[in-house]
Amino acid sequence: PYLNQWLSLNPAVPGSWELEVDRVRDFVRDRVSWMDAMLSYGKVRQVNGIYQLASGMDLCIFSQIVNEGGETNAKAVLVSDIDMAVYGEDFKPIGTMSNSFAGSLDGQGHTIRNLHISGGDAMGLIGYAGFCSLSNIVFDETCSVEGKNNVGMLVGAARNGTVTISGVEN
């Protein structure tokens, strides 16, 4: 059959090839959104209000939660080692000038690998920090950070409060 013939393998969609393709697109879109919701894709699991970061994607989403969602007092723990190799450009430092990170991040001794941050001011895992607690985070030798002013692997700029740091290794 030719692409412009009226033929359908799906009895629910009599008509042209375009109608059948539209039907498949609708099915896939609905199915993918259902699977995303079932698998909590795009969401980070929480236990007792504490975000459980298990992957590079989780770390990127947590950054968005703080930076764009305004949850500056959010608490998170790393529940496994995190490899950021495929998330390099997607990760933005946690905490912005208008939404300084004021929560807690406990690495629980887990290692962050292949984290490469570059940009302007306040570059680090935590971009802008204020009244926060950072503990037990390990960065391996594959991690790097570059910027203009206020640059650090863990914290770029501390503002509006005390930053408590303990057990951080490189």
Regions found by a protein language model. Give the residues of each.
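Surface-exposed repetitive/solenoidal architectures
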Residues: 21, 25, 33-170
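C-terminal catalytic region of ATP-dependent kinase domains
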Residues: 1-39
